[in-house]
């Protein structure tokens, strides 16, 4: 299934966190926090401004982003667990 977000929404795949600490301790799923970093899978066309013109988003597919702890709605697309959120929920782009 092909999924295209509407408006200023962004489809994000969470980046998996390490399951083991540097000291070798394995972190069980019950105490792990969900990662707040992800990769943008797809973006909508943008939000409309006061004049009705579409303003393109700052993020694009392939960007690695940081987002708030409670941001987005969890969805399942083609068997993958993804998040859909507004661009305003994105805190920033991680640059290499």
Swiss-Prot record:
Function text: Together with the chaperonin GroEL, plays an essential role in assisting protein folding. The GroEL-GroES system forms a nano-cage that allows encapsulation of the non-native substrate proteins and provides a physical environment optimized to promote and accelerate protein folding. GroES binds to the apical surface of the GroEL ring, thereby capping the opening of the GroEL channel.
MF annotations from Gene Ontology: ATP binding; metal ion binding; protein folding chaperone; protein-folding chaperone binding; unfolded protein binding
UniProt GO BP: chaperone cofactor-dependent protein refolding
Major localisation: cytoplasm
Subunit (UniProt): Heptamer of 7 subunits arranged in a ring. Interacts with the chaperonin GroEL.
Protein name per its UniProtKB record: Co-chaperonin GroES
Keywords: Chaperone, Cytoplasm
Coiled-coil segments: none
Localization per Swiss-Prot or TrEMBL: Cytoplasm
A cellular-component GO term for this protein: cytoplasm
Top-level taxon in the UniProt lineage: Bacteria
One Pfam family cited in the UniProt record for this chain: Cpn10
Gene (UniProt): groES
Family as reported in the entry's similarity comment: Belongs to the GroES chaperonin family.
């Amino acid at each position: 299934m092909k999924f295209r977000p509407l408006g200023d929404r962004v489809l994000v795949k969470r980046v998996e966190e390490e399951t083991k600490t540097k000291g070798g301790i394995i972190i069980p799923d019950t105490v792990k926090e969900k990662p707040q970093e992800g990769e943008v899978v797809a973006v909508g066309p943008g939000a409309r401004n006061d004049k009705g013109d579409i303003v393109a988003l700052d993020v694009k597919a392939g960007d690695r982003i940081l987002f708030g702890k409670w941001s987005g709605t969890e969805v399942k697309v083609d068997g993958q667990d993804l998040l859909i959120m507004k661009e305003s929920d994105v805190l920033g782009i991680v640059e290499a």
